[in-house]
Amino acid sequence: MDTKAFKRSLHSSNQYHRKGFGHEAEVTEMLRFEYQSSLIQQIRENGNRFQRGEVTIQLAEAFGFCWGVERAVALAYETRQHFPTERIWITNEIIHNPSVNQNLREMQVEFIPVDEQGQKDFSVVAGEDVVILPAFGASVQEMQLLNDKGCKIMDTTCPWVSKVWNSVEKHKKGSYTSIIHGKYQHEETIATSSYAATYLIVLDLKEAEYVCNYILNGGDREEFLHKFRHAYSPDFDPDRDLVRVGIANQTTMLKGETEQIGKLFERTLMRKYGPDQINQHFLSFNTICDATQERQDAMFKLVEYPLDLMVVIGGFNSSNTTHLQEISIEREIPSYHIDSADRIGPGNRVEHKPLHRPLEIKENWLPEGPIVVGITSGASTPDKVVSDVLEKIFALKSTSPALIP
């Protein structure tokens, strides 16, 4: 499929929307009421440090809702305002935050059902319905299906994600295989790969090293295909399709690792084909999201403070939140990833998600005496959720009445 031509055609359709409908003032007030917090604003104005009783909070300099997330949520709210009686669907979670997605459900925005095989069932969508595409985007195939049905489409895809798609289009135009640094099952990576002619998804530097070793030294083709069996394009052949490669990434991956992977492939292809031929075999574009980078940079600064523990707040399926937790764990700071204040209590206990493990309960997680707690949150986490977590921590450590944010 000529994905570029399809996008041009879709974007010119009267049924397709990627801007608001004129309800900005009303929606802004709704979002302020539901997601902002005066306590968090107070802490920001105090240099991101705040003390109450025995608890000192050190907030990351950058955390929480990014511009792309705010835009997506606002467009979803505007869509409901503009189509008050129409049936509205969304192809996936608008963002990876349970409270925001629950609010959409309460606004009668329905999620496309998924069958036992994990496939979305679009048969429930009628031509007169409205369909929201989430911040992560949607695959070309999904957009084509919805367009063929004649649905009204509200596209809230983050512009940074669209930037990655444009890079992948350039790979395709130059007959380069797209090496995508990401998680093959993540909605954004699924959408990105749908724009590529040939692609291979690598999760981390270790997988990238395996691929680069294969490029230089060859190897067991069947072993390669089995190892990446969920992560490459149809008919992918490692002996044929790794001669010319371009680098792209899921925008929420660790910036440093994406850069390492890009440099590794560049060095590998330079060794194989020579410095004078590198432009014929390697293509790289900077597709790292500014907001992801800012939050990661802020986390690296935060872990330099003398902290007793770290609380990382965000959806458990949020890639950017997980990477923030990784930074804390690398510094050997006790770290607790929670998705809401409901995970704290009763008493001095917390239900949290350790890295790459299921939820578990930790008793007596807050130490006795004065403590300094580092706080950050993923790009899909509202300030109100962070504020609720802080109030729970203050309540556990102090008998003073909780401040109402």
UniProtKB/Swiss-Prot annotation:
Positions with a binding annotation for dimethylallyl diphosphate: H96, H186, S318, S319, N320, S380
For this UniProt entry, which residues form the secretion signal?
none
Q: What class of enzyme is it?
A: oxidoreductase
Q: What chemistry does it catalyse, as a reaction equation?
A: isopentenyl diphosphate + 2 oxidized [2Fe-2S]-[ferredoxin] + H2O = (2E)-4-hydroxy-3-methylbut-2-enyl diphosphate + 2 reduced [2Fe-2S]-[ferredoxin] + 2 H(+); dimethylallyl diphosphate + 2 oxidized [2Fe-2S]-[ferredoxin] + H2O = (2E)-4-hydroxy-3-methylbut-2-enyl diphosphate + 2 reduced [2Fe-2S]-[ferredoxin] + 2 H(+)
Keywords annotated in UniProt: 4Fe-4S, Iron, Iron-sulfur, Isoprene biosynthesis, Metal-binding, Oxidoreductase
**Entry keyword Transferase:** no
Cofactor(s) annotated in UniProt: [4Fe-4S] cluster
Write down the Gene3D superfamilies for this protein, in alphabetical order: 3.40.50.11270, 4-hydroxy-3-methylbut-2-enyl diphosphate reductase, catalytic domain
Can you provide one Gene Ontology molecular function annotated for this UniProt record?
4-hydroxy-3-methylbut-2-enyl diphosphate reductase activity
Give the binding site residues for isopentenyl diphosphate.
H96, H186, S318, S319, N320, S380
The entry marks the following residues as binding (2E)-4-hydroxy-3-methylbut-2-enyl diphosphate, namely H96, H186, T251, S318, S319, N320, S380
List its EC numbers. 1.17.7.4
Q: What residues does [4Fe-4S] cluster bind to?
A: C66, C158, C289
Return the cofactor note field: Binds 1 [4Fe-4S] cluster per subunit.
Gene Ontology terms describing biological process: dimethylallyl diphosphate biosynthetic process; isopentenyl diphosphate biosynthetic process, methylerythritol 4-phosphate pathway; terpenoid biosynthetic process
Quote the catalytic residue positions. Answer: E188 (proton donor)
Q: Which InterPro entries match?
A: LytB/IspH
Which Pfam families does the record cross-reference, listed alphabetically? Answer: LYTB
Q: Which family does it belong to?
A: Belongs to the IspH family.
Question: In UniProt terms, what function does this protein have?
Answer: Catalyzes the conversion of 1-hydroxy-2-methyl-2-(E)-butenyl 4-diphosphate (HMBPP) into a mixture of isopentenyl diphosphate (IPP) and dimethylallyl diphosphate (DMAPP). Acts in the terminal step of the DOXP/MEP pathway for isoprenoid precursor biosynthesis.
**NCBIfam families assigned to the protein according to its UniProt record, in alphabetical order:** ispH_lytB (TIGR00216), PRK13371.1 (NF009911)
Protein's name according to its UniProt entry: 4-hydroxy-3-methylbut-2-enyl diphosphate reductase
Originating gene: ispH
